[in-house]
Design a protein with these regions (language model features):
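A generic local secondary-structure boundary/capping motif
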Residues: 97, 155-156, 205-208, 244-247
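Cys/His-rich short segments
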Residues: 81-152
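Residue-level signal for inorganic ion chemistry
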Residues: 65, 130, 217
């Protein structure tokens, strides 16, 4: 028997991490304890999960946690180590409701492959229930009402007419640049595999694009690009269920 501890150190609170720590108290195969060092409203936070058991189930636990704890832009370090005695607890961490955290996309690694992959049987099921992130609870009635047929029609309109007002998301999409103003142009990346063909990116920028927050990042187009003429662009991946599915259709 050995004790291990898995740490996730963040520069600020990440409500989803606290929620996932709480969920792992239900992991019956091992003795689990959890905690958060410096768990307050400001400053660095280290979320941790401790487990006691034999080598094989401990390895299975570590693999499961690595899959569940998706990258956050606020994550600064993570690790696993052997400890002498657990320091955590069996009580739930106090946390803000992750469903109300607007900085995190309303989908995760469990539900996205089901509704966001064009080869999946439930592709386009915007209101798909997820037992992990519960992203469906954060959808508006207008978002929930959209079907795959609706989204395909929107994509067709964008392709044929050149623009689309996506009222349920409060945005407009266009195949051509909008009228220039003081702000940087913003681009939705529909095919992540083409990133390096268009932009000069570092590894940490690619990781940030794929993080649970799905942020806009500033990127410079490659030299002599035939269509991207601005010096800098704000780019992002699909950051909501609707935009993610629409991106997959347009891909």
């Amino acid at each position: 028997m050995k004790n291990i501890r898995l740490d996730f150190t963040c520069s600020r609170q990440v409500p989803l991490y606290a929620y996932l720590c709480n969920q792992y108290l239900n992991y019956d195969a091992l003795n689990i304890s959890i905690g958060c060092d410096n768990h307050n409203d400001f400053g660095p936070q280290t979320y941790f999960i401790e487990a006691q058991g034999e080598q094989a189930p401990l390895e299975q636990l570590a693999d499961a946690i690595a899959a569940d704890f998706l990258m956050s832009v606020w994550l600064v370090d993570s690790g696993i180590k052997v400890i002498d005695e657990p320091q955590g607890q069996r009580t739930l961490l106090e946390t803000h409701d992750p469903q109300m955290d607007k900085s995190v996309a309303a989908f995760c690694q469990q539900c996205y492959p089901l509704f966001g992959d064009n080869q999946a049987a439930q592709f386009g099921a915007i209101d798909l229930t997820c037992s992990c992130c519960h992203g469906e609870t954060r959808l508006t009635p207008a978002q929930k009402a959209l079907t795959l047929t609706d989204l395909k029609a929107m994509a067709e309109q964008l392709i044929t007419q050149g623009s689309l007002a996506l009222s349920c998301e409060g945005i407009a999409l266009s195949l051509e640049p909008f009228a220039r103003d003081a702000s940087r142009p913003q681009l939705l990346i529909c095919n992540p595999n083409t990133l390096n063909a268009h932009f000069c990116l570092k590894d940490h920028q690619v990781v940030a694009l794929s993080s649970i927050e799905k942020p806009l990042i500033c990127a410079r187009p490659i030299q002599d690009h035939q269509k991207l003429f601005a010096p800098l662009y704000d780019i992002c991946f699909g950051y909501s269920r609707v935009v993610a599915v629409l991106s997959e259709i347009l891909r």
